[in-house]
Amino acid sequence: MSLLETRTQFDLSQAKAALLLNVPLRTYVRYESDDSYGSELKREMMIKTLKDVCEITETKGLLSVEYIKNSLKELFEKEYPNRIEFCYLFGSYAKGYAKENSDVDLCVSTSLSGLDFVGLSESIRTILHKKIDLVRFSNLKNNIELINEIMKDGIKIYG
């Protein structure tokens, strides 16, 4: 993977990539646009550093609400058309105090059940690269406190 491909994978501007790498913008631009400039070892280290800094895993990195919203909208429309009525983000991500190891709490209204619901959960985890806590809205009838939290602090991300 090239420096340009790595930068675009993480949706970074050249200025942001240079800042993360602690190199002048002009130097970064030369490395990205001219393969004969500098050493291959430095270029590989720049790529590795960008991946280390920007990569999202279950225990590293934070997702934006916008990223969660866009990723799940695409998943629901492509893989589960007409099967997801709505989805709310709640918990630490919705309240704005998520940490790198925070899970993503989601409440969905869906007709999926059994292994199909488990498959939905796994698809979301795979796309977001984070642990998720997926609850079905219909299962919350006896949990008024959680319903109130979702209605008060939750962010509608689909439906």
Regions found by a protein language model. Give the residues of each.
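Short helix-loop-helix/strand-helix junction enriched in hydrophobic and basic residues
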Residues: G91-Y93
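Catalytic core of pol beta-like nucleotidyltransferases
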Residues: M1-R83, K95-E100, T110-G159
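Short beta-strand->loop micro-motif that forms the acidic, two-metal-ion catalytic signature
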Residues: D105-V108
